[in-house]
Design a protein with these regions (language model features):
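Short amphipathic alpha-helical segments
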Residues: 25, 89-100, 218, 222-225, ...
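Short glycine-rich, low-complexity/disordered patches
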Residues: 39-52, 102-126, 145-161, 228-244
Length: 244
């Protein structure tokens, strides 16, 4: 999809303000998640009522970060230098995220009211002419009296009804494209430095519907379909960007 995939994020928005870290609940929660490679980590969330300790786990193999916050449960996977081999494809990530999110919600007897998946990546194999052509296509920018723009942002959002499991819900579908200079390094050694196109793809259900309705089956259904939606979204975006 991208030259470098930098982040996957899967989120289940849930009323979980009352769920705080308790040592006595750590082992039962780990048993419910059923993954021996999860390691408990420290997490303190700043809330309107003060600091609260929350559950957090890191997956030893993939580096997935599971955070059970007061208003959302997140699974995040970030690119590990030098080669990002931990990222895998989005379908495999969503499959693992579905188990972590649904296991967490089931353990605490909760349902989510909103679901979201975000993919961030970089296009690095571009020359200066590619940047100029892309800026012309996306921006229709005014002539400011200098050279072509070296930094810019472009963003679009639309609503699409999508079916998954027993649900047919309206989703927000967003694409964010930006030019920026990026430096990537590992152990103090530079891996990449230069201009890139950053792309963020985001598909999430209607934030205005606060009804707790997504149980574990709903989460698995959503995350089982979203990789296909993301592939289609990227194909449409890539075709628009480069005319391919």
């Amino acid at each position: 999809m991208f030259d470098v995939t930098t982040k996957y994020l899967a989120s289940a928005f849930v009323d979980a303000e009352s769920i705080e870290y308790e040592a006595d609940n750590l082992r039962p929660l780990l048993d419910a998640l059923g993954d021996s490679e999860l390691s408990a980590q420290n997490l303190v969330q700043i809330t309107q009522s003060g600091l609260k300790k929350r559950f957090r786990f890191e997956h030893i193999g993939t580096g997935d970060d599971l955070q059970l916050l007061g208003d959302r449960f997140d699974v995040t996977r970030k690119h590990k230098p030098p080669d990002g081999e931990n990222m895998g494809d989005v379908a495999a990530f969503c499959e693992q995220a579905a188990e972590l999110l649904s296991g967490s919600l089931d353990h605490f007897g909760r349902k989510a009211h909103r679901l979201a998946v975000v993919i961030d990546g970089l296009l690095t194999d571009l020359n200066e002419n590619d940047f100029v052509v892309l800026a012309d296509r996306l921006l229709n920018a005014p002539d400011l009296g200098g050279g072509p723009p070296f930094e810019w942002n472009w963003r679009i959002a639309t609503k699409i009804e999508r079916s998954f499991g027993q649900f047919a819900d309206e989703t927000n579908t967003l694409v964010h494209i930006r030019r920026a200079r990026v430096t990537m390094s590992a152990l103090g050694q530079p891996l990449f430095e230069g201009d890139t196109i950053g792309v963020s793809l985001d598909i999430n259900t209607n934030p205005e519907n606060k009804a707790a309705r997504y149980d574990s089956d709903g989460i698995r259904a959503y995350l089982g379909e979203v990789s296909t939606w993301m592939d289609d979204l990227w194909n449409r975006t890539n075709s628009f960007m480069f005319g391919e």
